[in-house]
UniProtKB/Swiss-Prot annotation:
InterPro entries: Hfq (IPR005001), LSM_dom_sf (IPR010920), Sm (IPR047575). This is RNA-binding protein Hfq. GO terms for biological process: regulation of DNA-templated transcription; regulation of RNA stability; regulation of translation, ncRNA-mediated. GO terms for molecular function: RNA binding. The keyword RNA-binding applies. The keyword Membrane does not apply. Pfam families: Hfq. It comes from Desulfitobacterium hafniense (strain DSM 10664 / DCB-2). The lineage of its organism: Bacteria, Bacillati, Bacillota, Clostridia, Eubacteriales. PROSITE patterns: SM (PS52002). Belongs to the Hfq family. Signal peptide: none annotated. GO terms for cellular component: cytosol. RNA chaperone that binds small regulatory RNA (sRNAs) and mRNAs to facilitate mRNA translational regulation in response to envelope stress, environmental stress and changes in metabolite concentrations. Also binds with high specificity to tRNAs.
Length: 83
C-alpha cells in the first residue's frame, strides 16, 4: 500500500487550529496578524482576533509563527490515521 506524502503545510495549520494555539502571521509586506487559525484551504487562511475574522491569501503570507513549538511527528501520524 502506498502512503500518501505528508503535507507539512496542512499538518501544521491543522494542528495550531485544533489546539487553539495563538499564531503570528507575517505578511510579505511586513504587516503582522495575531490570532487563532479558524480554517484554511489551498489558497486562504482564516484567522480570528478579538472576535473578528480575517481571510488572508496564502500568497501574501511570509511566515506563520506559533506561540509554542508544534509536534509535527505526532500530528502527521494522527492525520494519517484519520484517512
Amino acid at each position: 500500500m502506498n502512503k500518501a506524502p505528508i503535507n507539512l503545510q496542512d499538518t501544521f495549520l491543522n494542528q495550531v487550529r485544533k489546539e487553539n494555539m495563538p499564531v503570528t502571521i507575517y505578511l510579505v509586506n511586513g504587516f503582522q496578524l495575531k490570532g487563532l487559525v479558524r480554517g484554511f484551504d489551498n489558497f486562504t487562511v482564516v484567522i480570528e482576533f478579538e472576535g473578528k475574522q480575517q481571510m488572508v491569501y496564502k500568497h501574501a503570507i511570509s511566515t506563520v509563527m506559533p506561540l509554542r513549538p508544534i509536534n509535527l511527528v505526532a500530528a502527521s501520524q494522527s492525520s494519517t490515521e484519520e484517512r
